[in-house]
Each structure stands twice: as structure tokens, then as C-alpha cells.
Amino acid sequence: MGDWMTVTDPVLCTENKNLSQYTSETKMSPSSLYSQQVLCSATPLSKNVHGVFSAFCTGENIEQSISYLDQELTTFGFPSLYEESKSKEAKRELSIVALLNCMNELLVLQRKNLLAQESVETQNLKLGSDMDHLQSCYAKLKEQLEASRREMISLQERDRQLQCKNRNLHQLLKNEKEEVQKLQNIIASRATQYNHDVKRKEREYNKLKERLHQLVMNKKDKNIAMDVLNYVGRVDGKRGSWRTDKTEARNEDEMYKILLNDYEYRQKQILLENAELKKVLQQMKKEMISLLSPQKKKPRERAEDSTGTVVISDVEDDAGELSRDGVWSLSCDTVREQLTNSIRKQWRILKSHVEKLDNQASKVHSEGFHEEDVISRQDHEQETEKLELEIERCKEMIKAQQQLLQQQLATACDDDTTSLLRDCYLLEEKERLKEEWSLFKEQKKNFERERRSFTEAAIRLGLERKAFEEERASWVKQQFLNMTTFDHQNSENVKLFSAFSGSSDPDNLIVHPRPRQKKPHSVANGVPACTSKLAKSLPTSPSDFCPSRSCVSEHSPVSALTVTPEETKPNEVGRESTDQKWSVVSRPSSREGCYGGCSSAYTSSHVERDDLP
């Protein structure tokens, strides 16, 4: 048969074109529609039809073409194009009706196929678009999942760090509360001891006052007298002057002048001594304030070693000077001078010891709460033994001074002076005593005024200390936020910082701390307000200063005392609660009650009283 090509009808071509445009114009892409239109309109209709018919059917092969079409249609299940003949020999004729019916069926099938093809193409386009959309959604969700995982890991790490910081802060708060409780107990014990000392001093003062009144104010009992028999004359042979009223009056005037001069001289000495003691006390106050001030230098090991050697040498010097044999032969001035020197040296010892402990505590805080440096057991025992020896010597020196004063009072009053003093009850003496009493009251008022101003200054320092603590807390919180090691975006960082600090401006995160002349540093903080109480309540004699340190040697082999100033808060007018950090590093064999006894005895010299005389 040869190669045959499909015969296309021009009418069918136009119908197919219209049908395809009708069914798939909205579903197909513009490029496909354009290409279809170009293919359909590329050649004129007459030329196309002529070329197709010239290729498939010609005037010579009409019968063959019809028979071929009939065979093809019958194979596809269509009825035959020829009419059935009654006789076999008769020639079959072409049935126009069958041909038209077949053509109609073919057109219907073609339309159905085109519709199905269009629906399939539309469905494929929908599925393709859905697939692209799902793939894009899948990529976006995958990226979001990775970002959320990274953010979750960073938040978990941040949460862990915050929990660790919170635990550390809770532990610090607990330690601070314990220190506050200990310091309150120490203050109470000091107050009771101060009250007892004041009562004892008042009793001694009353006794001395009564003794002076008996010696000076009482009249002479004229009924009791003694006459001298067998009077021995003078060596030169002269007679003694008769005792007349004039001579007795002149002698009494001379006696009163001598007494007045003696009293004035004693008053000057007492004023000078008070001035010296005030200078010493003021110096001790300044040193205590500078010691517990917020401006703490960095700890220096060499300086600590040098101060330690100075402390040992001072203790040895005190031990050499205040010997037991030399105290009995010393005068009051020498004893007073040595007392002043010993108090100064003891204060230097206390200052160096507190500075050493303070430097150790600051070093521990700066190194991130590492193991605390503890004084060795042997050094502690040696220091406590030296302190005990010094305390004993001071006690003996005080006893010797009291005995010397009593001896002077006893020897000053002989028979002649007592007989003369009993007759010197005069109005001028009363007026002089009244003047002295008024002077004493003025001094008392001045002292009360100074104490009030000192208390107000301490309260102001406490308020400033509180404000500084608030600023320091905000600064520490912002420093903690700046220490995070996660690299978020800038907007996220701003949001996080604004959530914690209440401001999204990065400039607000920088805190400039105030000068540290008034307020101390923290996690180990200074105590500027408590210095007023410490300095105001410092002991004025070795009997008040030394016994406070006598109990340090008890249980000394098993404990070491560490003092670090921490914090003060004003409670009432004239009273403040001092917060100092007292920590005891005990060895495994130490007793539980060692710390309480040592700390209470060590701080028993610090007392406070509002109703001073």
C-alpha cells in the first residue's frame, strides 16, 4: 500500500481549532496558544487541502482509498462503508449513509478525546502548581524549623546560665542574711557590755566624789583635839610664833591658795590629757573610716607580708616595754604615755590584720569564689598567745596605776592637812564647785551635740550607701546581660535587652558608677556607715580594748577568723545595723561552738548608748 498519511478535512481542522480554543484557552499558557495559532494559520486553507488530497487520494486510487478506509474502520469496530449485496457476484456499492455515520462517530470521538486531553492537561497544570507550592512551603518550613532549633538551643543555654546565676545569688543572699544576724547579735552583746562598763564607771566616779567631799567639805570636829606635852624647842633656840587668829587666818589663806593652785594645775593636766586622748581617738576614727571606706586598693601580697612582720615586731616591742617590774616604779605621766603608745600600736595591729583579711576576701570575690585563703594554724596560735600576754600585761599595768593613785591620795592627806581641810568649808568653795559643775554641763552639752552630728552624718552615709547598692545591682544585672555569648540579630538583641532592663537604647546599658569615696564596692561591699559606730564606741583604755581580744585564743587551733566589711542600713535615729562579713574557716576537727564564742568575744568592745552622761 505504501506510506499513507492521515487525511485532514479543512472543516474538521477549523472545528478542532475552535474547540481547542474554547476548551483550553483559559488553561493553557499563552506561548502554547500562540504556537497553535501560528501552526493553524501558517498556510492558506486551499493550498493545505490541495496538498493533503494530492498526497492521499487521487483520481486514480479512489477505490483503493475507500477500501483502505473501510478496512481501517471495520478494524476499529465501525460498520462497513459498503452496502451488503444480496448476491456474491454483484459489485458492492458505497453507502453514503454509513460513510456519514462513521464520520459523525469519528468527530464525536475526536471531540471526546480533545475534551479528555484538555481536562488531563488542566489537571496536570493544577498538580504542577500544587507541587511547586508544596515544595516552596516545605523549604520555608524546613528553614523555620532550623531557625527554631537554633533559637531553642540558645535559649536553653541562656536559661541554664540564668539558673546558675540565680543559684549563686540565692547563696549570696543567704550568706548575707546570716552575716546580718551575726552582726546584730554582736551589736547587742557590745551594747550590754558597754552598759555594764558605764555603770561600773559611774560607781567609781560616785565613790571618788564622796571621798573628795569627805576630804574637802567636812568641818573639823573641835571636840576632838590633841595637845603636845614636853614641847621640844627649835635648834636655833628661837621661840615659835604664837598661834593667834591672825596667824591661823593667814595660814588658811595660804592653804587655800595652795589648794587652788593645785586644783588649777590638775585641771590643766586633765585638759591636756583629754585633748591628747581626743586626738588619739580622732586618729583611730579616721583610720577606721579609711580602713572600712569603699576605696579599697588591690590586695598586695608583699604589703601583707610586710604588715605581718610589723605586727609581730609591734607586739614584741609592747611586750618588752610593758614589763612587770618596770610598771611599779613609773609615774602617772609615764604610765599614761605608755598607755597611749600601746593603744596606738594595738590599733595598728588591728588595722593591719583587718586589711589583710579584707584583701583576702576581695581576692576571693575577684577570682570567682575560689577557695578562701586561711591563716595557718601555727601563726594563729602564736598570734593568740602574744595577744594573751599583752592583755595580761595591760591588766597588771592598770592595777599598778590604780594602786599608785590610791597611794598618792593616801599619802597626800596627813594629819596636818586633814585637820586643816576639815575647817575649810566656805562659801567660795561652793561657788567654785558650782562653776566647775556648770563647766562640766557645758562640756556635756557640747559632747551631746557632737555625738548627734556624728550620728546624722552616719545616717546620711547609710542612705548614700543604699543608693549606691541599688545602682550597683542594676550595673551588675546589665553586665550579666552583656556577658551572654550568643550572636543574635541586632533587633533580637535590642528586644532582649529591653525586656530585661526596661529600655531598648544601648546607651542606657552603660552605667557610670559614682566615685567610691562615699560608697563601697560590692559582692564584698564596704561599710562607711558602720565606721561611725565603730569609731564612736572604740575603747579608751586597754582594759576595754584588750579583753575583747582575749577569747580569740580559745579553740584557736581549729578556727580562723576572717572579717570583711559588707553593708550598713540605718534602722533608727542614732542607731545603725552594721553588716560586716565574718566568716570562719574551720578545720574538720573544730568544735561547733568555737565561732560563736570567738566572734562575740572579738567584737564585744563595740558598744552603743544613747543616754550618755
Swiss-Prot record:
Q: What is its main location?
A: other
Q: What UniProt keywords are attached to this protein's entry? A: Cell adhesion, Cell junction, Cell projection, Cilium biogenesis/degradation, Coiled coil, Cytoplasm, Cytoskeleton, Nucleus, Phosphoprotein
Residues with PTM Phosphoserine: S290, S293, S313, S537, S541, S543
Q: Name one GO molecular function term.
A: protein-macromolecule adaptor activity
Coiled-coil regions listed in the entry: 126-227, 266-293, 375-461
Query: What ranges does the record give for the region Disordered, renumbered to this chain?
Result: 361-381, 507-527, 565-595
- Any single biological process term in GO: regulation of Rac protein signal transduction
The source's superkingdom equals: Eukaryota
Location in the cell reads: Cell junction, Adherens junction; Nucleus; Cytoplasm, Cytoskeleton, Microtubule organizing center, Centrosome, Centriolar satellite; Cytoplasm, Cytoskeleton, Cilium basal body
This protein's GO cellular component annotations are:
adherens junction; cell leading edge; centriolar satellite; ciliary basal body; cytoplasm; nucleus; protein-containing complex
Give the Basic and acidic residues compositional bias ranges: 566-579
InterPro entries in the cross-refs? Adhesion_Centrosome_assoc (IPR052300), Afadin/alpha-actinin-bd (IPR021622)
User: Which family is annotated?
Assistant: Belongs to the ADIP family.
Relate the protein's function as given in its record.
Answer: Acts as a centrosome maturation factor, probably by maintaining the integrity of the pericentriolar material and proper microtubule nucleation at mitotic spindle poles. The function seems to implicate at least in part WRAP73; the SSX2IP:WRAP73 complex is proposed to act as regulator of spindle anchoring at the mitotic centrosome. Involved in cell movement: localizes at the leading edge of moving cells in response to PDGF and is required for the formation of the leading edge and the promotion of cell movement, possibly via activation of Rac signaling.
Q: How does it assemble?
A: Interacts with SSX2 and SSX3. Does not interact with SSX1 and SSX4. Interacts with VAV2. Interacts with afadin and alpha-actinin. Interacts with WRAP73.
Protein name, please?
A: Afadin- and alpha-actinin-binding protein
